[in-house]
Amino acid sequence: MGVQTTVHLLRHGEVHNPEGVLYGRRDGFHLSDLGTRMAQRIAETIGERDIVHLRTSPLERAQETGAPLAAVRGLTPVVDPRVIESSNVFEGLSFGDGAMTIVKRPHLWRHLYNPFAPSWGEPYDEIAGRMVAAIHDARDAARGHEAVIVSHQLPIWTTRLFLERRSYVHHPKNRQCTLCSLTSVVFDDDRMAQVRYSEPAGDLIPVGDRSAPFSAGGATQEDRP
């Protein structure tokens, strides 16, 4: 066995989003009080591990999620635009009606022609490509130790599908990537050996939000995705 290095992909915590907006890459969406507790739970759970490198998405919710862990480990996070949320033409819409949100807007139908790309947002191949490049850099920075990358649900899930050689086509509610979950990529030297999944803050997630495609902390039931 060679040198083992683990890169943890950490999804951000719950976001204060009372209008249930698909926020995507928009600025101004911060962690809710519950999201802050989730971030603190991460620091408490893995803060004593051999984590020597931390990088985050540029978006506020990701940086706020990584802050408690950075403080515990005495690390200065690297802000990496390669691990940002994926782009999406539906950004800014409220999805309280689920798929009906789009059905009611015929002008948006033209974006639905190809679920394999997908035609409504950043191509899956491009998401996986930029994420894997960031993972490799984090692995190299933490070789023989552990690293954490704070990112977002779709980039993390797309990366896992790529690493496990599975189809990118999926239903958003079937993603195994809850708030503040860890998708841990274990390397043997430069070879990926396995992918692990855990939910250190799983007990803090409201039952109805576990399979939500994005976070809507503070939203009424009608406005939640």
Task: Locate predicted features.
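Acidic, low-complexity terminal tails and accessory targeting/binding regions
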Residues: 1-5, 78, 85-98, 145, ...
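Generic beta-sheet signal
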Residues: 7, 145-153
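Loop-to-helix element that buttresses phosphate recognition and phosphoryl-transfer chemistry
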Residues: 11-65, 69, 120-132
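Phosphate-coordination/substrate-recognition cap region in phosphate-metabolizing enzymes
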Residues: 41-108, 224
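Glycine-rich phosphate-binding loop signature in dinucleotide/nucleotide-binding domains
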Residues: 48-50, 138-145
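Active-site signature of alpha/beta-hydrolase-fold catalytic machinery across serine-
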Residues: 68, 158-162
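Short glycine/proline- and acidic residue-enriched helix-loop micro-motifs
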Residues: 105-126, 219-224
